[in-house]
Amino acid sequence: MVCIPCIVIPVLLWIYKKFLEPYIYPLVSPFVSRIWPKKAIQESNDTNKGKVDCKGADMNGLPTKGPTEISDKKED
């Protein structure tokens, strides 16, 4: 059985997005743009962007140094 808020909240969000936001957003956006005038993310000209050094880790992200075996046996 699905809880009531799991049904009601998405419906209310859809109603807001479809009918209320076109009227509310133009009224609120000038105030928001005054509060946050700058862009949140600034691009950098880093040439190494996207290159990752994976030499110290195994394919699943575990370090390669030391034992990597995980036993399923319960130890007392």
UniProtKB/Swiss-Prot annotation:
Pfam families this protein is in?
Answer: DUF4512
Necessary for its localzation to the endoplasmic reticulum and lipid droplets, as annotated region = 1-37
Record keywords = Endoplasmic reticulum, Lipid droplet
Query: Where is composition skewed (Basic and acidic residues) in this entry?
Result: 46-56
Endoplasmic reticulum: is it a keyword of this entry?
yes
Residue span of region Disordered = 45-76
- UniProt main location, coarse: endoplasmic reticulum
The question of whether Cell membrane is a record keyword is answered with no
Superkingdom per UniProt: Eukaryota
What is the recorded function of this protein according to its Swiss-Prot or TrEMBL entry? May activate the NF-kappa-B signaling pathway.
Q: What family is reported? A: Belongs to the UPF0729 family.
What's the name of the protein? UPF0729 protein C18orf32 homolog
Q: Which organism is it from?
A: Pongo abelii (Sumatran orangutan)
